[in-house]
A protein has these predicted regions:
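Hydrophobic packing residues in well-ordered alpha-helices of helical domains and bundles
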Residues: 19, 26, 44-47, 66, ...
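Structural secondary-structure packing elements that flank or coincide with functional cores
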Residues: 90-128
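Generic L/I/V-rich hydrophobic alpha-helical segments across diverse proteins
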Residues: 23, 30, 51, 70-73, ...
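Long, amphipathic alpha-helical coiled-coil segments characteristic
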Residues: 4-47
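Histidine phosphotransfer helical core of two-component systems
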Residues: 14, 77-90
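Extended, amphipathic alpha-helices with heptad-repeat/coiled-coil or helix-bundle character
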Residues: 42-79
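Secondary-structure edge/capping motif, primarily at the C-terminal ends of alpha-helices
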Residues: 26-37, 58-61, 77-80, 102-105
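Residue-level recognition of alpha-helical structural elements
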Residues: 8, 36-43, 66, 83-87, ...
Length: 128
């Protein structure tokens, strides 16, 4: 049984490292699109792919909140056609939480999950 536990621990560590790298790529893409260095449609498609991947894997490795944050990020990105400085700052809010939770190594308790999810940017709030 110890060998299986070692494998699971290694896979979780790989997920953590991969997710931190994805957060870096997401933030780089946000900066490049907001700065006009990359085309918005290409960058936004890349953001969707990265968020979708994190969403799909997070729960399997004990980070359901990271999956929920990535899902919210996907929803936020869904209607974007460009990324200005305000959108960039809002998008970084998602990666900041993803990074903080992943670096902690554990999913927060339920009451903290609720607080974090309520703090995330939404498109409907921005439109109003």
């Amino acid at each position: 049984m110890g060998n299986a536990d070692d494998i699971v621990a290694r896979l979780k560590q790989d997920f953590i490292e991969d997710t931190l790298e994805r957060a870096d790529r997401i933030e780089t893409t946000i900066d490049r699109v907001a700065g006009g260095m990359d085309k918005a449609d290409v960058g936004i498609a890349e953001l969707r792919r990265e968020a979708h991947t994190v969403k799909g894997l997070a729960g399997s490795f004990g980070f359901p909140l990271v999956g929920a944050i990535a899902h919210r990020m996907e929803d936020y990105i869904a209607e974007l056609t460009e990324i200005d400085d305000l959108e960039a700052a809002s998008l970084v809010d998602f990666t900041t939480w993803i990074r903080e939770i992943i670096e902690s190594g554990t999913n927060p308790p339920a009451e903290e999950e609720t607080r974090i999810l309520r703090s995330l940017p939404t498109r409907s709030a921005k439109k109003g």
